[in-house]
From Swiss-Prot:
Entry's family note: Belongs to the RemA family.
PANTHER family according to UniProt: REGULATORY PROTEIN SSL2874-RELATED (PTHR38449:SF1), REGULATORY PROTEIN TM_1690-RELATED (PTHR38449)
Organism field: Thermotoga neapolitana (strain ATCC 49049 / DSM 4359 / NBRC 107923 / NS-E)
Lineage, uppermost ranks: Bacteria, Thermotogati, Thermotogota, Thermotogae, Thermotogales
Top-level taxonomic group: Bacteria
Cross-referenced InterPro entries: RemA-like (IPR007169)
NCBIfam families associated with the record: PRK04323.1
Name of the protein: Putative regulatory protein CTN_0877
Length: 92
């Protein structure tokens, strides 16, 4: 029920599939990124820019974004509230 979330540079993801949006600086997340690359489950949506967030999906795919985690989370919540508002108006 979150719709599509813009993660930068015209890329969008299905909000319902997102498990976490995290900062990529910790060692465990760097290992997770490396493992996803080996398994063919890494999606790089940075367009060559610095990775500022890692998005983890329910299918164990790892998506790299050049947008800050806070910004993506804000877009996530804006989409949620917009969909909620639309659903409430439709019930009236």
């Amino acid at each position: 029920m979150y719709g599509l979330i813009n993660i930068g540079f015209g890329n969008v993801i299905a909000g319902d599939r997102v498990i976490a949006i995290v900062n990529p600086e910790s060692s465990p997340l760097k290992r997770m990124k490396d493992e996803a690359k080996i398994e063919g489950k890494l999606i790089d949506a940075t367009y060559g820019r610095k990775t500022r967030s890692i998005i983890i999906t329910d299918s164990n795919h790892i998506i790299l974004s050049a947008i800050q985690p806070e910004t993506i989370a804000q877009r996530f919540m804006e989409n949620f509230y917009e969909i909620e508002k639309t659903l409430r108006e439709g019930k009236k």
